[in-house]
Amino acid sequence: MRILVTNDDSIYSPGIAALAKAARDFGEVRVVAPDVEQSSMGQAITATRPLWYKKSPVHFEGVEAYKVNGTPSDCVALGTHLWATTDLVLSGINVGYNLGNALWHSGTLAAAKQAVLLGVRGIAR
């Protein structure tokens, strides 16, 4: 199984490292995450400037990782495009709580929704 891991708290968040490590037990993992915090971005996508991605300076043991100058939804779209087949997108582990009205603008949840829009299963935590 090919698992794409992302978040809205950035490539430097301890939550994404923990999620990527746990996901390794279930398949091949790739991390594609924002280069800076993108909390509360909702389903936003970048349309007014070029997107770039670079190998991550953060080391994820046994996992290929990239940072992106975009939103969580951008990361999912780019990550699934770069990887011919993606079976599952995991988004998180979020630093804060995604409860109640916060769900409407959660970048963490939006990444999982973006996966579904692209025909891939998505889970947010």
Name each model feature, range by range:
Residues 6, 32-34, 91-94, 124-125:
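Short beta-strand segments
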